[in-house]
């Protein structure tokens, strides 16, 4: 497969996860999913950075992205394309990707708290990769992706994540650049 087509198809597949990962930074806040509770080690279970509002809007906008993808496929690519999962398929795929993304983010926060890292402290690789790994784990059993696409996503996602964090920091949407 041509590298450019491979890149496009991999990003097209994972786009709802990228959106779901970014939206809580903009629309999050409010009640944390751990209700402010501490784990048996005395540290917060997850922390203030993962909220119900951010989780809800992350999943919602991930699904909206999937719905938009469906209509883009129909309008510009035609129904006889590799990207045509159908409307219901896009809704399910985007829900799985968005849910996996936010679960991965929660798990990453949980692990960081176990290592006594506060919200906003950097945990290289963990910060950049858990969301994509869990997005793929949630979606892959129902919507498999070629191995070369998975490898490509595992390589480019940390770069995209890092770059988008710098942009969010410059736009004053994040307090730290990582």
UniProtKB/Swiss-Prot annotation:
EC numbers for this chain: 2.7.7.67
One of the Pfam families matching this protein, by short name: CarS-like
Pathway the protein contributes to: Membrane lipid metabolism; glycerophospholipid metabolism
Membrane-spanning parts: 3-23, 56-76, 87-107, 123-145, 150-169
Described purpose of this protein according to its UniProt entry: Catalyzes the formation of CDP-2,3-bis-(O-geranylgeranyl)-sn-glycerol (CDP-archaeol) from 2,3-bis-(O-geranylgeranyl)-sn-glycerol 1-phosphate (DGGGP) and CTP. This reaction is the third ether-bond-formation step in the biosynthesis of archaeal membrane lipids.
Keywords from the named record: Cell membrane, Lipid biosynthesis, Lipid metabolism, Magnesium, Membrane, Phospholipid biosynthesis, Phospholipid metabolism, Transferase, Transmembrane, Transmembrane helix
Entry membrane topology: Multi-pass membrane protein
Main location: membrane
Sequence similarity: Belongs to the CDP-archaeol synthase family.
GO biological process terms, semicolon-separated: glycerophospholipid biosynthetic process
Compartment(s): Cell membrane
Source domain of life: Archaea
GO terms for cellular component: plasma membrane
GO MF assignments: CDP-2,3-bis-(O-geranylgeranyl)-sn-glycerol synthase activity
Descriptive protein name: CDP-archaeol synthase
Enzyme superclass (EC): transferase
Reactions it catalyzes: 2,3-bis-O-(geranylgeranyl)-sn-glycerol 1-phosphate + CTP + H(+) = CDP-2,3-bis-O-(geranylgeranyl)-sn-glycerol + diphosphate
Cofactor: Mg(2+)
């Amino acid at each position: 497969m041509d590298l450019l087509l491979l890149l496009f198809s991999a990003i097209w597949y994972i786009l709802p996860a990228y959106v779901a990962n970014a939206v809580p930074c903009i629309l999050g806040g409010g009640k944390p999913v751990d209700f402010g509770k501490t784990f048996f080690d005395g540290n917060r279970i997850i922390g203030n950075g993962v909220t119900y509002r951010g989780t809800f809007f992350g999943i919602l906008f991930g699904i909206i992205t999937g719905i938009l993808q469906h209509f883009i496929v129909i309008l510009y690519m035609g129904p006889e394309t590799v990207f045509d999962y159908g409307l219901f398929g896009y809704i399910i795929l985007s829900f799985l990707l968005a849910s996996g993304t936010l679960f991965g983010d929660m798990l990453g926060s949980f692990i960081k708290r176990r290592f006594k890292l506060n919200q906003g402290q950097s945990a290289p690789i963990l910060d950049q990769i858990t969301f994509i790994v869990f997005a793929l784990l949630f979606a892959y059993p129902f919507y498999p992706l070629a191995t070369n696409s998975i490898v490509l996503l595992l390589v480019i996602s940390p770069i995209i994540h890092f770059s988008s964090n710098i942009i969010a920091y410059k736009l004053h949407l994040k307090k730290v650049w990582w």
